[in-house]
């Protein structure tokens, strides 16, 4: 596929993403070489927590949880979701080359979430999708 830097992840608790609750196994392709290792939330200064409250019921529930996670005043579940988002967005930031380490990627994702920029982008995306729905009708 031509990718130059990729992280394939699978958590010990069965998620196909980086887990807030357990160790995550990683196969990282970088500079033509694959390295396998594991990571935990504590390695990036995030406290490991259960996934209780993060199970999504439907798209409306998902949107509400994301708004809570990205908002200025977060509930306890919103805090947990924000950490889960930072863990996974941090990987994307790292493999995109914006940072030189996964830990730096998570820190940048955390700053973007807590600085309000992530919620601003979500609002822009939400408004854009509303305009698309007008064309479907």
Where on the chain are the PLM-derived regions?
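Glycine-rich anion-binding loops and their surrounding alpha/beta cores
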Residues: 1-137
């Amino acid at each position: 596929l031509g990718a130059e830097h990729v992280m394939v992840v699978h958590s010990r608790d069965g998620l196909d993403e980086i887990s807030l609750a357990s160790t995550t196994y990683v196969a990282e392709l970088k500079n033509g070489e694959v390295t396998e290792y594991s990571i935990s939330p504590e390695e990036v200064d995030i406290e490991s927590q259960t996934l209780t409250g993060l199970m999504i019921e439907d798209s409306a529930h998902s949107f509400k949880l994301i708004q809570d996670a990205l908002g200025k005043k977060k509930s306890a579940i919103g805090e947990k979701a924000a950490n889960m988002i930072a863990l996974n967005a941090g990987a994307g930031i790292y493999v995109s080359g914006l940072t030189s380490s996964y830990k730096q990627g998570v820190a940048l994702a955390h700053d973007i979430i807590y600085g309000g920029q992530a919620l601003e982008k979500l609002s822009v995306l939400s408004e854009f999708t509303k305009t698309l729905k007008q064309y479907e009708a």
